Amino acid sequence: MNSKFRYLSLPLAIAALSCNLSQASSHREAPNITRAPAIDSTDFYAYNSYEPGRGNYVTLIANYIPLQDAYGGPNYFAMDPTALYSIHIDNTGDAVEDLTFDFRFAQALAGGEGVKLNIGSMGNTQAVAVPLKNVGGVSVSDMSAVNFSETYGIKLVVGNHRTGAASDIQNVTSGGTSFKKPLDFIGTKTFGSLEGYATYANSFIYDISLPGCASNGRVFVAQRKDPFVVNLGKTFDLVNYVPVEGDSAPGAGDGKGFPGGITQSSSNDELRFKNVTTIALELPKACITGTGNGTIGARTTASLQQPRILNPKPSFNKTEINGGAWTQDSRLG
């Protein structure tokens, strides 16, 4: 797991530990999922870790919440606290999960009620809650201006996802079983610079202890640039592509390719300025291959509980009541 989480250019759906790879993607094609973008999985990647010294690890990346704009405030793109996000591993080749990592998210306001500012004339002020994610600059060394935070816990389920034995994943970096998710990228005034945000976000990479595993893994959940490449508008406009290469070779600039063709360019990628929310796990190979042949299959799912009752007088943490059995609403592998 590279500390900057740079992605391979080829989308990888299933990774064998011998590097046999295939590709897949989903960007909101299922009609019902458009009503719940927070549980919409856009891509799933699995590959051998390529950071120096990490050759004995596999990285699994599940991306959620498609088509995020950097200016998508004031609420930005929180994960759904009523959902169950899962990464499943099949290490016996029977298309049934043997290991599942379940993620549950929680939200909180600063001090329980959020930051309040005194509004009004002197002697007649009223404390008014601020409806913003932050009220000042944010950095690794000073997060006092953060007004909204997300945390998450992880459970490892062995066997059947719904009925198997579950154990908490331990946070080796800071202790306990809770992990923090950084704010989305709000802007350079908030974080000082692009580099300032990178430093801030990287501080949320955690070492994790896996039950029964001699080596630690790592986890990271945060907003990242969407690594997928596609011309979405032309695709859904009756596959309205012009010939891709207008030159005899990419970059030749001689116009001797397809008549009316275009030179390959990142400007044709309509996701180049879009973000997603990444759930990334880096796991020791020895602890996930089981007794199979050393090859794994993997997928991600998101589930919601069946009954939901909306609160007619909602508060921050009580907008609805959820209960009952979990139902899979999103799947990608």
PLM regions: where:
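Gram-negative bacterial Sec-dependent N-terminal signal peptides
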Residues: N2-Q23
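Surface-exposed extracytoplasmic segments
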Residues: Q23-G333
